[in-house]
């Protein structure tokens, strides 16, 4: 019975040997396992291994108490990727899945304790082994292993001999390129082909998988072929590395040679006392341009221009052109200027705007909204705003205040009367004296790509044979295009989308519709007398006193004198003329202070105002002393504010009826007069007007101050009311004024400039105003202090107007 068991056991051992597995014999079948994350270890090596995990160190201590034999297996890639290439001690390893199945045995020759608590062991490796199973995994793994037997090459195998010879030859080439010691070269000259493969594979910088394949290949013939493949891959890699190294070496040698020659040239010129202006300019430009870190098209253009510049003589005209062009590039803000959004304070911003400008609430609110959006977005974004209003209301000066609020730079340029588009977009460099346009010049001066740009008087641009500046502004103000704005002189794409554009105009009538669509329009109305006086007290008087060196205690203004200046000298919508008269007064006082040092203080009142500013420029507006039939007061709006407009009509007998117009009326107002005439004629029966009135009379319509041009549609209902008053021979109710456009069917349509018209009416003592019902919203937005003391009547048909006339 025992003999049969032994026989069967012997048969099993023979079967294992045939399969490439050696019987255990006297070698240990169970050993501690060390899992390493690096490349596989081959038999016949002497290697150091650093261990830091507790389980590995305990396994080493256990092995050294016995025969010192350990098993070395490599962690596979799946495990390392899953654990981010970290093989630290706290990771849980499933040895049946996480290690390669073939490893080696090794004997611990020496152990060194490391300062951080780890071990550095030196191991001599022996046999290829196969992982069978874990038999104990308490504090460290002990595994059962099978010893693998390699299949040797037959002595008469000519192919293997040829491969063996190639390996010897190519390995020596690799060692020669790597400049390895002669000891390692001698190691190659061994007869054992399997051992040769292991030694060569361990010295080649192949992948972990390739090394593992060599380790797992038990057939030496196949192992020879695999190693030869790896050798050729290594030689190809060496060839590529040598080419790269050679190219780098050649470039370095060329640079060193150029540097040496340049230094020699500098030394020779210094010895001869010859200055090298071009070299100095070139070096300065290169240093500045390098700091910009340009990319793409700008970098390519700069490199070409630098190369051209280096070949030019300083005496040539093009030398200056190229240098100026490169200097422009160095001075432009190519990098983003970052606004510190946390420092943008809404309350402080509001205070700054209120301190510098009175009123203008819509503009201030828009700026506060813009700052709020910036703080929320945390990214820069430009804006395009058009301020429309009469002269002198602060449209231009508000730009500097906005820049201060946004903590950025301010740049202003006027386009009033501009006819050449090159002023905005630059001249091409082929022209003599070419310059960049105002946009690029502004960026160059402010040195930031997010400044506040104020483009003044945009409504006064005029087209010519030199191009249309309006068309250029379309590109500048289009968010889709200004990301890559291309100035003719610079001829490179430049991002101006972060610029805060403010444009000013007195009227939008001359601005093309496509340009208006690109802008947010904010209308700034003129100031009433009370507002002008408040502005004078808070802003203008301290300003003119400071500018003229007059102490505030040396000059006082009575309130009545300021009212008189506003009403009789500076009646425009703005405060520019008001400031001029204040300046005139202060200058005269300054002269008196110098000429008569005994008088220390002066006071301006109604009694002495004419002494300083002369006779009044305007008469005080009021209702006529006497009203007649055919007379009606209308209201007009101009770029300089509102005014009253007295419509006068008389009839003269004639065989043929008709209408005669005088008072320098414009085409639109003439059409309004004809429409009013036709409308009243069409309803004469309803108003009990005789048929002969229009058939046998010529109606003469006149608007006084004939030297002043007058135009616009808003006098339609006023003219019709004058015709009705004349036809009925009735005087309209006292202190009545009106404004509204009249259609041919009697509808009353919307008008503009309502606030200014009401101000003018109030100044003239008007108590009743007829307004189109379509202007209800405009009327509600007008401050109560302006509307106080006036009764308003909203109408949408001429018949409603007629009921209010008498």
From Swiss-Prot:
The active site is at 714, 757. It is an enzyme of class 3 (hydrolase). Its main location: cytoplasm. CDD domains: RecA-like_Lon (cd19500). Induction: By heat shock. HAMAP family: lon_bact. ATP-dependent serine protease that mediates the selective degradation of mutant and abnormal proteins as well as certain short-lived regulatory proteins. Required for cellular homeostasis and for survival from DNA damage and developmental changes induced by stress. Degrades polypeptides processively to yield small peptide fragments that are 5 to 10 amino acids long. Binds to DNA in a double-stranded, site-specific manner. Homohexamer. Organized in a ring with a central cavity. This is Lon protease 1. It comes from Borreliella burgdorferi (strain ATCC 35210 / DSM 4680 / CIP 102532 / B31).
């Amino acid at each position: 019975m025992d003999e049969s068991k032994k026989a069967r056991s012997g048969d099993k051992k023979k079967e294992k040997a045939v399969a490439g597995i050696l019987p255990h014999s006297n070698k240990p079948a169970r050993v501690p396992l060390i899992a390493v994350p690096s490349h596989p270890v081959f038999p016949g090596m002497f290697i150091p291994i650093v261990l830091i995990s507790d389980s590995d160190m305990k396994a080493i201590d256990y092995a050294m108490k016995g025969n010192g034999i350990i098993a070395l297996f490599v962690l596979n890639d799946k495990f390392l990727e899953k654990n981010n290439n970290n093989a630290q001690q706290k990771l849980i390893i499933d040895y049946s899945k996480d290690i390669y199945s073939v490893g080696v045995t090794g004997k611990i020759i020496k152990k060194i304790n490391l300062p951080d608590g780890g071990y550095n062991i030196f191991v001599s490796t022996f046999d290829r082994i196969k992982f069978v199973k874990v038999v104990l995994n308490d504090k460290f793994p002990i595994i059962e292993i099978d010893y693998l037997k390699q299949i040797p090459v037959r002595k008469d195998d000519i192919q293997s001999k040829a491969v063996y010879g190639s390996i010897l030859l190519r390995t020596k080439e690799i060692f020669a390129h790597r400049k390895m010691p002669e000891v390692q070269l001698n190691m190659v000259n061994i007869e054992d082909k399997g051992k040769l493969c292991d030694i060569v594979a361990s010295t080649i910088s192949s992948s972990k998988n390739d090394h593992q394949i060599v380790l797992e290949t038990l057939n030496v013939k196949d192992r020879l072929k695999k190693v030869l493949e790896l050798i050729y891959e290594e030689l190809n890699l060496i060839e590529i590395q040598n080419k790269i190294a050679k190219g780098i070496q050649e470039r370095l040698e060329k640079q060193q040679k150029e540097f040496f020659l340049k230094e020699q040239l500098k030394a020779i010129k210094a010895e001869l006392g010859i200055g090298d202006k071009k070299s100095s300019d070139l070096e300065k430009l290169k240093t500045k341009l390098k700091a910009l870190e340009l990319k793409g098209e700008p970098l390519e253009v700069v490199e070409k221009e630098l190369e051209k510049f280096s070949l030019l003589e300083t005496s040539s005209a093009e030398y200056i052109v190229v240098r100026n062009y490169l200097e422009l590039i160095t001075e432009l803000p190519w990098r983003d200027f970052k606004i510190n959004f946390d420092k943008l304070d809404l309350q402080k911003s509001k205070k700054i705007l209120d301190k510098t400008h009175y009123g203008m609430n819509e503009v201030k609110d828009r700026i506060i909204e813009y700052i709020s959006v910036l703080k929320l977005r945390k990214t820069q974004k430009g804006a395009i705003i058009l301020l429309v209003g009469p002269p002198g209301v602060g449209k231009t000066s508000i730009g500097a205040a906005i820049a201060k609020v946004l903590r950025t730079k301010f740049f202003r340029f006027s386009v009033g009367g501009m006819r050449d588009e090159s002023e905005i977009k630059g001249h091409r460099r082929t022209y003599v004296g070419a310059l960049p346009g105002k946009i690029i010049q502004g960026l160059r001066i402010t040195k930031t790509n997010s400044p506040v740009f104020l483009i003044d008087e945009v409504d006064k641009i005029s087209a010519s044979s030199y191009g249309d500046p309006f068309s250029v502004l379309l590109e500048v103000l289009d968010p889709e295009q200004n990301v890559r704005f291309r100035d003719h002189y610079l001829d490179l794409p430049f991002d101006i989308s972060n610029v805060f554009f403010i444009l000013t105009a007195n009227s939008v009538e001359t601005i093309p519709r496509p340009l208006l669509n690109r802008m947010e329009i904010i209308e700034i109305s003129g100031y009433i007398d009370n507002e002008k006086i408040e502005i004078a007290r808070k802003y203008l008087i301290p300003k003119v006193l400071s500018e003229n060196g007059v102490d505030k205690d040396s000059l006082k203004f009575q309130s009545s004198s300021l009212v008189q200046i506003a009403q009789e000298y500076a009646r425009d919508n703005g405060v520019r003329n008001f400031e001029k008269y204040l300046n005139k007064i202060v200058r005269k006082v300054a002269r008196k202070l110098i000429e008569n040092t005994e008088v220390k203080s002066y006071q301006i009142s109604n009694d002495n105002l004419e002494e300083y500013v002369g006779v009044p420029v305007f008469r005080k507006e009021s209702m006529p002393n006497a009203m007649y039939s055919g007379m009606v007061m209308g209201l007009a709006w101009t770029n300089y504010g509102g005014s009253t407009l007295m419509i006068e009509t008389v009839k003269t007998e004639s065989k043929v009826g008709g209408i005669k117009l005088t008072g320098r009326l414009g085409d639109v107002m003439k059409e309004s007069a004809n429409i009013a005439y036709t409308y009243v004629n069409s309803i004469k029966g309803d108003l009990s007007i005789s048929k002969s009135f229009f058939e046998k009379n010529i109606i003469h319509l006149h608007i006084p101050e004939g030297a002043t041009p007058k135009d616009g549609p808003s006098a339609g209902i006023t003219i019709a009311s004058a015709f009705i008053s004349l036809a009925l021979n009735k005087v309209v109710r006292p202190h009545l004024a009106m404004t509204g456009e009249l259609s041919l069917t009697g509808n009353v349509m919307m008008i503009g400039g309502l606030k200014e018209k009401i101000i003018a009416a109030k100044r003239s003592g008007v108590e009743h105003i007829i307004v189109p019902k379509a202007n209800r919203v405009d009327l509600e937005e007008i401050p109560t202090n302006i509307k106080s003391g006036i009764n308003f009547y909203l109408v949408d048909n001429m018949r409603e107007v007629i009921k209010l006339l008498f």
